[in-house]
Amino acid sequence: MRSLRERLRAGETLVGDGAWGTQLMARGLKPGESPDALSLSNPDALVEVADLYLDAGADLITTNSFGASPLNLERHGLDGRAEEINRAAVATLQRVVADRALVSASVGPTGRVLAPYG
């Protein structure tokens, strides 16, 4: 598979995946639970979602790691597990995606308002 850079330079239009949170809720994620923790506790759900988007023609699949910052994970009792969760999210997608698409990291906010604003 050509790299992202090569594909963009060639003017190729790329299609991304969709809403991971909605798909994970349909697979049992409860309100208030950390979707990022599923990278450890239920990687099969990630495989199912990625397969749906791949079958729909996505060229870019994002990791299940939007809220996997240390500060955000702390709120869910997952202190010190950010690296483990992020690595698991990437590894799971690399296995399922293989050479069918590109894997992109999803990086969200910390979940906290930091000084001087908060």
Tell me what each language-model feature is.
Residues 1-118:
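Domain-level signal for soluble alpha/beta catalytic cores
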